[in-house]
Amino acid sequence: VEKIKLPQVHIHPWKIWKFGILFLFILLLGCGHSPSITATLVPSPLPSPLPTAGITTISTPDTEAAARAYLNAWKQEDYPSMYAMLTQVSKDAISEDAFTQKYRSVASEAALSNGIDYQILSKLTTPKSAQVNYRVVLHSILVGDIQRDTVMNLSLENGQWRVQWDDALILPELSGGNHLSMDYKIPSRANIYDRNGHALVAQQDAVAIGFNTGEIHQNQQDELLNLITRMTNGRIRPETLGPQIDNYRNNGGWYLPVTDIAADELAPYEARLSGFAGVILQPFRTRYYVDDIAPHVVGYMSAIQKDEVEVMARLGYKWNERIGRDGLELWGEKYLAGKRGGTLYVMDPSGKTVTVLADSSTEPSQAIYTTLDRDLQLGAQQALNGFIGAIVVVNKNTGEVLAMASSPSFNPNLFEPTNYNSQLLIGNLYGEDRPLYNRATQGQYPLGSVFKIVTMAAALKSGIYTPDTTYNCGYHFDELVNVTLNDWTYDHFQKDGKTQPSGLLTLPQGLMRSCNPFFWHIGLDLYSRGMTTAISDMARGFGLSKSTGIEISEETGNIPVPASPLDSTNNAIGQGATLVTPLQVADFVAAVGNGGTLYKPTVVEKIVPPDGQPTYVFTPTISSHLPISSTDLTTIQDAMVSVIKDPHGTAHQVFPNFPYAVAGKTGTAQDPPRDPHAWFVGYTFVNRPDKPDIAVAVVLENQGEGSDWAAPIFRGIVQLYFSGQRSTFPWETQPGVWKTPTPSVTDTPSPQDTATP
């Protein structure tokens, strides 16, 4: 008999209890006429619920967060943090230094100027391991973006995800110890020209010239020196080179480095020069800086240094290249160097090519045409021979810099290692006189009495002073408590016994005579009236104490706010803590001359690729306007004209019968305990259609009085600009040749003495 297994029925005890009560109730109802029974039903208590089972949940760390932490550290080039995230097995396989070098090598070889970016694509997580798929983009300045999808494997160690590292985490192609190698494609560097197309810098053959002084025949020496002077257009003078030859000859006949010259410039003289005993010519090919023209504007190139190799590699440069270091060579690197290209190879550990990872072509370099006028620039450089100082010449109505000279100057060709004279002369570039320092834009000087232009503007704007305001200009200023200041006329009286004080002057006459007491009074008066910042605010409105925006390196100077009555007097005449650059001064003097517009100065006229279609052409940029009325500006202009035209003007005797309309201001800025700086600034208003009017600033460090030294140079620059030649300075026998270390002093009757503080 087949047994049938009945299904088990499970009935909860509570249901059985309820069923029993119901049965008893029915039974009682069926007992006829039995006496009624009142029953109170009390249910049994419910069984207590079972306690909740104890469950411990162990959470797995966020896989994506771990991957992002690693990739973010890579993006930030935080290699120590990346290494700290590796598994112990990975750390055992590669040291931190080797790990770091892997990433740095890729960044350098691939020229990752902008680093990397990444994107998480997906993830897969198990209790003990995980995989994260990500896309990495390497941004190469040479071959463009390199994009790869890669897998990161992670292991759980001590409750944290750790990266299982191998080379493929950088790029899949680097698996197995492969590495990258860049084959650079470098366009030829473009030239730099003056505004008229004359080459200032170009690739060409050159020759280093030197003398074996022991072999030079003394009876031929003068002829040889004169030939060198002609070859170098007067840059090297017999009176300078001759004593050097004698000194070297008398001390063993050593080799004397003389100069270098472009091969085509040497050609007409080469046969004659080679005929002199002791002359040594060493040819070389280089990026040649013609005639050392405007080296502080053009700049120079030099080799990449050891500590720069990695940084420059990231920018697409080979370790053995030369780069722009200053001036336009630095500013215009992206134009002059062109767009570099390259082929990025994957190489196996034996050095064999595995594949080409990326490739790009070059784009041609672009020439820079400067605003400089070659002949005017050479004239400005010659005018500074024997001085330490600077000259700036700007187009009065556009801000274009026509000449910018700084002295002492330097020869950029000495940075060329194939120049035979380089190793012997390059040390001179780092002497105490700092020839590499651009005094025109980086030199910061007290402005002296030239600053009175600013103070006069502040006085007129205040409403307290008018052109008719007068002041008795005596020898002394005694408005300060317990301090007496002396006018320049008193200092001269102590020397010559006859210079008289200027007497009663109107405000414009005060500028014409450069009366210190008048301007001391203005500074103190404005300060005492609570107009503490009137002069400093005006100075900033004239563009001082801020960058001009020119393309090359510059300093901002300093315009202080007076903190005491004595400060207020010092600041009013451009002394105290007042500092300016010659470029700033030329810029604001141009604004005074053009009606009040401050232009952003520039040395770049246009940028031109090989096809001849400029990618940039200069247009004037207005920086601001002088914060004075046209009426007040006219008053200042007239006063500056009187500095030159009025017989009592401090520069009158420098411009006798001068054919060009000019306005200016002398300045002699005290620099104790040394001699003062000589200043002269001014502008022309000739209005010739073929020659735009100019503004000029001249400063000579610790040279003396502005009227004696700087004013004649200003006059010569104006002559050269308009006529192509200049007269001889008082200290010269001919242009560029000094006759004495100081100019002769011409006695002039008072009050025509020209010294100004």
Regions found by a protein language model. Give the residues of each.
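Extracytoplasmic/secreted envelope proteins and their assembly/folding machinery
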Residues: 64-71, 79-87, 96, 100-103, ...
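Beta-lactam-recognizing serine transpeptidase/beta-lactamase-like catalytic domain environment
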Residues: 346-357, 397-449, 454-700, 706, ...
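Short solvent-exposed beta->alpha transition segments
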Residues: 49, 55-58, 64-65, 69, ...
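Bacterial N-terminal signal peptides that target proteins for export
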Residues: 6-20
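C-terminal motif of bacterial Sec signal peptides marking the signal peptidase cleavage site
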Residues: 27-30
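Extracytoplasmic/periplasmic proteins that interact with beta-lactams or build/remodel peptidoglycan
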Residues: 34-43, 119, 123-390, 410-439, ...
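Short hydrophobic alpha-helical segments used for membrane anchoring or interfacial signaling
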Residues: 391-396
